[in-house]
Amino acid sequence: MLKEILDPESCAKCRICCVFDSSDIWEMPVFTSETAEKMRSTNPEINFVPYGNGFVIDPGELGESELFNCPALTENGCMLGDEKPFDCRIWPFRIMNVGGIRAITIASLCSELYSRPLSQLVDFLNKGLAENIFRYADEHPEIVKPYDDGYPVLKLERKEK
């Protein structure tokens, strides 16, 4: 989904979007029931918990400096390929609730995109990605995260009257 703007090789080397600590566990992607079942079939120890109409992984208690790797992350990248959660397909973009308005933001952790001019990122969103994100969020409201002020807002949703 982001191959036009984000180099897949850079992503494969970085993997920061697949590793969580206690401060960013709220970023855990929302999995569909089908994807959760597929992952459980390869690793029955994964603890999925309901989250809206989907599921998130419960990593258990994480110590202050402890890291949790997504169980779908392998040596070769994500084992889910094209079936990865929507959150993962659009990362480092996020959809968040900013004072009752949905907004597309960007995670500062992705140095590949965060270092680019904001105008370039907004232009990319305006080529259809923003519309796809808002449409998906209409069908799957559980992917809308509460706003975190560390995430610059790139685009606010404009509701037609």
Predicted regions: what they are:
Residues 1-161:
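Short loop/turn segments that flank or connect secondary-structure elements
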